[in-house]
């Protein structure tokens, strides 16, 4: 895995549950070499924690803005996260 230079928490809103968004996110994360997790939230949004090289995180956020076929992303919020206790892979956690 790549060295973690940055970590970002992301919340994606819109039609993002029931459309394969988490599996698609995991696949895109693996392609880009970022680590972290993705999960569904009770309010219908999807949350993710993404860590890796700055350029890979930027590319991942751009992909999250588009989402997979069948999704309709209406918003993406990001905030810087701590690099402590980061996963070494990318997981679907809920």
Curated annotation (Swiss-Prot):
Chemical reaction(s) catalysed: an acyl phosphate + H2O = a carboxylate + phosphate + H(+)
Source superkingdom: Bacteria
Pfam families associated with the record: Acylphosphatase
Protein keywords: Hydrolase
Domain Acylphosphatase-like intervals: 7-94
Signal peptide limits: none
Active-site residues annotated for this sequence: 22, 40
Keyword Zinc applies: no
TM stretches of this protein: none
Species the sequence originates in: Rhizobium etli (strain ATCC 51251 / DSM 11541 / JCM 21823 / NBRC 15573 / CFN 42)
Record bears the keyword Thylakoid: no
A GO MF term: acylphosphatase activity
Name the record gives this protein: Acylphosphatase
Family under the similarity heading: Belongs to the acylphosphatase family.
EC nos: 3.6.1.7
């Amino acid at each position: 895995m790549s060295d973690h230079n940055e970590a970002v928490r992301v919340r994606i809103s819109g039609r993002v549950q029931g459309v394969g968004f988490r599996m698609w996110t995991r696949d895109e994360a693996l392609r880009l070499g970022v680590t972290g997790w993705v999960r569904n939230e009770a309010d219908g949004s999807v949350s993710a924690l993404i860590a890796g090289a700055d350029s890979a995180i930027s590319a991942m956020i751009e992909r999250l803005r588009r989402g997979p076929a069948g999704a309709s992303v209406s918003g993406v919020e990001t905030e810087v996260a701590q690099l402590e206790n980061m996963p070494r892979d990318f997981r679907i956690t809920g």
